[in-house]
Amino acid sequence: MCGIVGYVGHRPARDIVVDALRRMEYRGYDSAGIALIDGNGGLTVRRRAGRLANLEATLAETDSNDGDGLGGSTGLGHTRWATHGRPTDRNAHPHRDAAGKIAVVHNGIIENFAPLRAELEAAGVEFASDTDTEVAVHLVARQYTQGDTAGDFPASVLAVLQRLEGHFTLVFASADDPGTIVAARRSTPLVLGIGDGEMFVGSDVAAFIEHTRDAVELGQDQAVVLTADGYRITDFAGNDHLEAGRDFREFHIDWDLNAAEKGGYDYFMLKEIAEQPSAVADTLLGHFDKNRIVLDEQRLSDQELREIDKVFIVACGTAYHSGLLAKYAIEHWTRLPVEVELASEFRYRDPVLDRSTLVIAISQSGETADTLEAVRHAKTQKAKVLAICNTNGSQIPREADAVLYTRAGPEIGVAATKTFLAQIAANYLVGLALAQARGTKYPDEVAREYRELEAMPDLIKRVLAGMDSVAALAERFAPSSTVLFLGRHVGYPVALEGALKLKELAYMHAEGFAAGELKHGPIALIDENLPVIVVMPSPKNAAMLHAKLLSNIREIQARGAVTVVIAEEDDDTVRPYADHLIEIPSVSTLFQPLLSTIPLQVFAAGVARARGYDVDKPRNLAKSVTVE
């Protein structure tokens, strides 16, 4: 998500930090900032909302006025992707303590920031921003001046780290200790660059690849103290018994800058597919507490949720497919009727809306023109509108009554991947919140469903680890002119999404069908050697859909088609009928799409690459569709 850089050494930090921020612009951001510490104990912070050019203009203005404060050989930099607080100058990083002595930059979410902020405010601390980040710098300042580690900057940071909950990377610098940077990570990435008489720290190696190729990747719940002469890695308690190779990884970077931005992958899309475990985990983070779904930021009370008597979901493209999946979950958990509508069609058919209607508008960018117009139409009919969006401060959340942000981070590839899985997770959170408020699920039932959802990131990692065979299948079927996708129940929207991905990336004719419709026309398309990809329901499915889809597969094979079947790993009955079998872990029916989608993403990217197309920038498509 956010881009972080830190430098301590013998050269002027300003240009090094700004250049590093420029190299990390590919990550996406809505504001940028820099903190510089000079040898005289001065800390200067400059930050601006908008593009990096805005920050550079501010730095140039400082130069023209007096030029003071922008020297020094220790610096921090940050490009922000907003999660707490709107994208404004005051919410941009770095943040400082009240005395202006300590600066911090942060990526991730401090889950327990609300009670920590209340504690600090009760002690008289005044906050200058709406962010969770500012809590960390005030806690360190108090620990440094009043705590049992007073006067010891690194020890004060470690003491505070032990109080923080969530997923985060934090990097601190202090004017009282100008040659030192203290950094830490929990779940979000952090790498060090080892130079000659200088050290770097960053969200990824793009931050320092022009200066050094020797790097260290920190492990989970580890901190590092950096000086120009070297580094010391500890756990959050300060223990330094850690060993390279076992607890953290030392490596040499062989990539060029272009590859570094993509994390060593050939395309951003492949990198983003690999980031799906963290996209889902981050979207769920902080939304379950004391056996309850907690959606504080969405701004709809339990009473308002109880008054809902029908739900409409409006979206376009991949987001529409996530809405189709949400229908199954919300209806099952809440017993509310749910309609899913293409946003481009919604307002042209005079849908029946009123004050008891909840309209869920799903948009990755928050700027999708058709979805925005659907939101405006719903508002004129007095319906309540909940936006599910990946971009803080965008137009759709601003006009909606409530918002639930996915936390997938910037998605550079035009074809949606990690934002799709994050949308599914967010949709399911809404469904569980509705069930909880309406009493259609007991608290222990809500908790059980959430715990299975919470377990999905680890299962997604397992699926990703087995994708080599899918890449090989993509090579084999790249010359095909048509591919069909079949599914039942939640497998049907997955089939639609698989077909869309293949159209977008490989410019190939692809269609997704509900398998029960096969006899009603699509079976006429089946001929010799046609690839048909089948998303198999669980053999434990109570509706007997597994047996019905087995029958469909036999019909397809009888006509000479080649079957590629995505099935759960304990599904032995499907093996004789699959020409190619892709196995995924066994999960409850509603959660299977979070796993079965992944092979289809990898397949589409592989076919596109084999056909010589740009996976990240398919022709005629844009990431954000801002015209109707």
From Swiss-Prot:
Chain segments carrying region Disordered: 61-94
SIS domain location, by residue? Answer: 301-440, 473-618
A biological process from GO = carbohydrate metabolic process
The Glutamine amidotransferase type-2 domain, residue ranges: 2-229
Q: List the InterPro entries.
A: GATase_2_dom, GFAT, GFAT_N, GlmS/AgaS_SIS, GlmS/FrlB_SIS, Ntn_hydrolases_N, SIS_dom, SIS_dom_sf
Which reaction(s) are listed as its catalytic activity?
D-fructose 6-phosphate + L-glutamine = D-glucosamine 6-phosphate + L-glutamate
Q: Where in the cell is it found?
A: Cytoplasm
Keywords of the record = Aminotransferase, Cytoplasm, Glutamine amidotransferase, Repeat, Transferase
Q: Which SUPFAM superfamilies match?
A: N-terminal nucleophile aminohydrolases (Ntn hydrolases) (SSF56235), SIS domain (SSF53697)
Q: What class of enzyme is it?
A: transferase
Name the principal localization, coarsely classed.
Answer: cytoplasm
Its EC number is 2.6.1.16
Q: Is the keyword Cytoplasm assigned to this protein?
A: yes
What are the catalytic residues? Answer: C2, K623
**What one GO molecular function would you report for this record?**
carbohydrate derivative binding
Give any Gene Ontology cellular component. Answer: cytosol
> What interactions and quaternary structure are annotated?
Homodimer.
The task this protein performs is described as:
Catalyzes the first step in hexosamine metabolism, converting fructose-6P into glucosamine-6P using glutamine as a nitrogen source.
NCBIfam families, A to Z: glmS (TIGR01135), PRK00331.1 (NF001484)
The name this protein goes by in its record:
Glutamine--fructose-6-phosphate aminotransferase [isomerizing]
